[in-house]
Amino acid sequence: LENAWLETENGRVVDFGPMDTLPSGHADLVVDGSGRVLMPAFADSHTHIVFARWRESEFVDRIGGLSYEEIAQKGGGILNSALALADADPIRLLDDAYARVEAMMAQGTAALEIKSGYGLSEASELKMLRVIRQIKERAPIPVKASFLGAHAVPLAYKNDRVGYINLLIDRILPQIAAEGLADYMDVFCDRGFFTVPETDRLLEAGWKYGLRPKIHANELDFSGGVQIGVQHNALSVDHLECMGEAEIQALLGTETMPTLLPGTAFFLGLHPPPARTLIDSGLGVALASDYNPGSSPSGSMPFVLSLGCVLLKMKPIETFAAATMNAAYALELQSELGTLSPGKRAALVLSRPVSSPDFLCYAYTEPWIERVELGRSLPSS
């Protein structure tokens, strides 16, 4: 809609329309949008932003030729983050993670999901989820928590996978439910991590406590993660670098949102997920940052838009929908966010003057955000 107005009141969208229908009357604040793009703020439905330290040494290892899996096999990767988190002070974890949330909000993110998964022990997983609960209480935006104890098998259980899965199901899940610490259940269902039968057992256990699945699937191989996710009515299946006709057919007609994480493919040099094939097959897709210290150290949703175009061959308008409306669905927030609709939250991003909406994806390092509204205004620096 070109040459338009939008009215908000008390943090909600009231109405919008062409300028020749602008209602007369007093407004407390008028913002000039001439030559600018106004769009819904982003929802980031897949992040790992509670962590104890960055992993730039692994970045150098990968430049030297090691793969993500090889780094993990020598004790790096997720296990590296788990060792650091075990000794981390919860207050420091909270302060560092909340600083990341503030930076993400300044770049237009108005809702996000945060996963555990760098704990890999009862004490550390619960510590992470309690930190996420504190972020929920502090943040002026909706935050959802996912329990990802099945992110990797910790070294202490290297020769006892069943024992670790039993720990997750019999000890940690009941405590999570007792404290109300999670909204979703996640499993890394992929080669070298958790198998389909293991994922099946874990997701079934999560459902017993009301935790709907949102799972990692098909990042490294045709793992069967998509199919088992759909079988358990997962809210989303995420990554999806390895997708074929069987996976597409499994998703069509379901309530499961395929969620693509182009930042990970970019940073790890992976073959990107086949977004064009998914979209042309009739599937909607969501885009998310996968913000984490090992494989996607960025929470910039504007950059994700650009990667959606450059890596995934999505059209700019498709990336806008994927990062707003579809991503809100992947957080069960579609009634509150994702579109500029009367009654919804007035979570908005206003660009600087630009030549067209396509510019927002094209100029991939340009600081194009002029104003963010999340119930309050934040600087975009």
Q: PLM features: what roles do these ranges have?
A:
Residues L1-M39, E137:
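Histidine-rich, glycine-flanked metal-binding segment
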Residues M325, R345-S381:
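C-terminal cap of metal-dependent C-N hydrolases
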Residues Q107, E179-G180, Y209, H232, ...:
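Structural motif
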Residues D28-D32, A145, R371:
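Conserved beta-strand scaffold positions in the cores of enzyme catalytic domains, especially
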Residues L6, G11, G35, H46, ...:
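Divalent metal-coordination and catalytic microenvironments
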Residues L79-D96, E102, A110-S223:
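Metal-coordinating catalytic core of metallo-dependent amide/deamination hydrolases
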Residues L29, G33-D96:
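Metal-associated gating/positioning segment near the N- to mid-region
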Residues R212-P213, F222-T339, S351-P353, L378-P379:
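Active-site-adjacent C-terminal substructures of enzyme catalytic domains
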